[in-house]
Amino acid sequence: MTHTEQGAAQTPTITTVLVANRGEIARRVFTTARHRGLSTVAVYSDADQNEPFAREADAAVRLPGNAPGETYLNADAVLDAARRAGADAIHPGYGFLSENAGFARAVIDAGLVWIGPSPEAIDAMGSKTEAKKLMEAAGVPVLTNLDTAEITEEMLPVLVKASAGGGGRGMRVVRTLDELESETSAAVREAESAFGDGTVFIERYIESGRHIEVQLMADNHGGVWAVGERECSIQRRHQKVIEEAPSPLVERVDGMRDRLFEAARAAAHAIGYSGAGTVEFLANDKGEFFFLEVNTRLQVEHPVTEATTGLDLVGLQFDVAAGFHLPSENPPALDGWAVEARVYAEDPRHDYRPMSGEVLRFDFDDVVSSFTGPHVPGIRLDAGPETAPGRPAVVGVNYDAMLAKVISWAPTRAEAVGRLSGALRRARVHGLGTNRDQLVRILDDADFRAGDINTAFLESTHTEVSTVPLADDDTVSVSAFAAAVVAEADATSTRPTRHVRAGFRLFGDARTTHRYTVGQGSGDAENGVDVDVVRSSRSSGGESVTLGSDRNVRLVAVTPPDGVNRDTGTPATVILEVDGIRRTLTVHRYPGGGVGVDSALGPVMLTERPRYDDPSDIVAEGALVAPMPGTVTSVSVTVGDEVTTGQKLMTIEAMKMEHTISATTDGTVSSLAAATGDHIETGTLLAVIDSPDASDTDNQTDN
């Protein structure tokens, strides 16, 4: 039977697809489904009821609650939603139930089409320990598992890994024997939270390896494609940050691609694989590689493979599920280079602290498509949230911190990297903090540009790219001045017409002070900046200011001259002369005091603050407050304990990751305001540490 004849016979078996997921991956699957004329069904938690993916589907079914266990991990609720909405197929996306063999069986037993590999294949790869045994038997190179009781100092460092999961959750590097028990326990807790299975195993940790993976696509008739490789070596906390296709290492090492593809196909045949999957390897610079795992689902980074092959991998998943053969014996040849950057709501400068709150604006230039392409030079944007004037996107703490994937394609790696760097640098990302600055720093790094990368890139050899913002102190001051100029124009436009322009005096100069916090809200404040706007009646030069660095800034023009409406999202353009060089800055002002300033100097997010601080906002010395909302998962100290700077006090789980709260000073724990299981908000008092130095100072008297 020809492919066309098969299509006529099989396509009607899928008419309505439910996506058992959320965010950008749900929107991605809906895109292909619409292209194929299929109806779409979303499931959504209470926290997601207003998200774009829930609005875009033809039908949406509520999963009551917010926690993953009661919503997106609730197999019975998802199946009931499919029945109620009339879906005849389920696509699991990635994460949540995507690699749950029991769920796959339940879907099939319910008479629905499962758009994924067989439950048997998922089972075979569901336990990483058993998977390694299967791969070793199939001739695929593997790293051996270690017995906890037999680990010695000479074997360190080792890696604790969740057997049931991926994405860096339930994964801990152990560098001393003293940490082995506590880090293993932490990995177990993360694995139980993320995957419902706390099983972990331990293997040798290769410090400077390279993460290489092969995209598989297999049908139900024995056809297997190795659809190119990807390199995902740029990681933080064992989660990928930047991915690319092809791999710079594989391009450089003769014969490595053939060996990788052979190993990947052997892995697929060993478990009778069908559908989309990925075989992950850890490689060294010599081109040697070791099996890590098979991800029995679509990967987050699948767009770079689509961009370099022209394939629609989700469409192929539909075809395989409908019983089609792969359309040819071999996959398309690779064309050009693609790079993907993951934009996370997190602060890399503070141990990747997750950020929650409002995304006020999320705009990128040069976007040629969303969720498909690009197959011409340009940018593809796969984003979960969307913003509009007066309608910010809200990011909570219940789910993963990834906001979007930004993908570039170009004929060469240098062009693709440069295009992505430029798009990220120029993007208008306003509101809560993200890792955008870090992504640009990585892409512009000389070693990254040369392809000299490894999995330790961010954590050891290039830590500075995580801590240096794109905007330096001078740029912050210049941007704050531009914001103050617009604030003055806004104030003038709202005053009665009988008044002259604010700040004008017949003789002498007028000075107005504006205060800003860098970041959005006091919880994000890294520092504050005060700006004096000086208008002179004796000079045609207009407003000017001398910054602390002695750089002179003069206002040339502001458009519109009478201010902007915060609610419409209309920006103001401010032209400044900075040390004799003209600069154009775009200023967006938002309800609530947020101000986004974008220019070639670097992006700056500010928050307007009152001229005088409210005493109630001042945190007492020694008090530790929650840097993020979340749930307290463990408390390691009690009242009266002596602690030292950096000592672990408690852990908080937010966005499916654990975060350590440490002592900021030596002293005694005088108060504990949080207990295990407590749900907390940003700014919640957690503990108070009395410092000996502070006590000595308080007790001093005059002699």
Task: Report the location of each language-model feature.
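Catalytic P-loop NTP-binding/switch module of NTPases
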Residues: 582, 586-626
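Catalytic cores of soluble metabolic enzymes centered on carboxylation/carboxyl-transfer
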Residues: 303-306, 311-552, 645, 678-703
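N-terminal beta-alpha lobe that positions the nucleotide/phosphoryl donor
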Residues: 1-279, 283-302
